[in-house]
């Protein structure tokens, strides 16, 4: 069984989130999604508009998602190992950065491949939040 993992805040769930989850599910048998807990969102200097429990339930109800787990830190490698994930799915805005090039090496050493999906243009939780202000 091929297990995939992705993580995010999923605040103000939108079509970009749905596209990522749909594409990810197309590449694995079981898709596990980490939803960032409110404390980690705050640590990163932001505030989620929707509380963790609601965001987790919204993601859990998506037909492409097999399981939801809390993302309480930024250590995706440890989480992938814990879950037995073969793939980590992320947005392509990280592709080619020095940090993610190094992550790719670390993940490959652990037998996990990072798959980058294109961001859906014209939509983001940040953009939606600004539109509502």
Segments predicted by a language model, with ranges:
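Nucleotidyltransferase catalytic core that binds NTPs
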Residues: 1-133
